[in-house]
UniProtKB/Swiss-Prot annotation:
The gene is hisA. Pathway: Amino-acid biosynthesis; L-histidine biosynthesis; L-histidine from 5-phospho-alpha-D-ribose 1-diphosphate: step 4/9. It comes from Pelotomaculum thermopropionicum (strain DSM 13744 / JCM 10971 / SI). It is an enzyme of class 5 (isomerase). This is 1-(5-phosphoribosyl)-5-[(5-phosphoribosylamino)methylideneamino] imidazole-4-carboxamide isomerase. One of its GO terms (biological process) is L-histidine biosynthetic process. It is found in: Cytoplasm. GO terms for cellular component: cytoplasm.
Amino acid sequence: MLIIPAIDLREGNCVRLVEGRLDRETVYSGDPVAVAGMWQSQGARMLHVVDLDGAFSGAPKNLDVIGEILSAVSIPVQVGGGIRSMEAVERLLELGAARVILGTAAILKPQLVAEACARYGEAVLVGIDGRNGRVAIEGWGVTVDKGTVELALEMKRLGIKRAVFTDIRRDGTLRGPNLEAIREFAAATGLKVIASGGVSNAEDLRALKKLEPLGVEAVIMGKALYAGTVKMSEALAIASGEEAEEGACCKKESSPAWT
């Protein structure tokens, strides 16, 4: 299982929101590029970058910062937020993104998903964000009358192989992931699943690790890493199935600049 640190961008800063609410924002760093480098230095093998301004406005807004991140790290980066045109897909891939995530477009522009999949294959993911089992779009401000599994199966028919599945009620809350919803989503869709939302401690990661046989191949971590409730070294050890014996020493990590 892959651990993917999240870098959420708003007005050029690295931030975290609670349940996607702008009025519950914490700014962790004014230098997202340095944050990306820090996660890479601590062993991350992929990063998850979200353009929050893009998600709320409908078009990418932090391309300069995203480009700097892509140039600064040597590990793959998946990017989402406001990608609702083929031009945006192409621009991000040209900048060096390994994957692009289509969220709102999955509902409003399914033809874009089909075209992007046909052209770029598994470099195209869908982000399916659920609130009480229903799909939320446009920066999570609008909930539509479609179930998360229903949408995932539609996207699978269009060629999608992998989905980022987020439980909005858990995102940024440190309340633990919605394991039942993740299990149901993975089992019902047969997609490769990247779970997101709510991870708060090592036990949460161990529980997600057990869902690997269902197709849960990765977990996006945000607030737990930024708040220090889980260390990167611990997360990586659990994800790889190589947790150290009790009392064993682990590699020392540099403390995040915001602590």
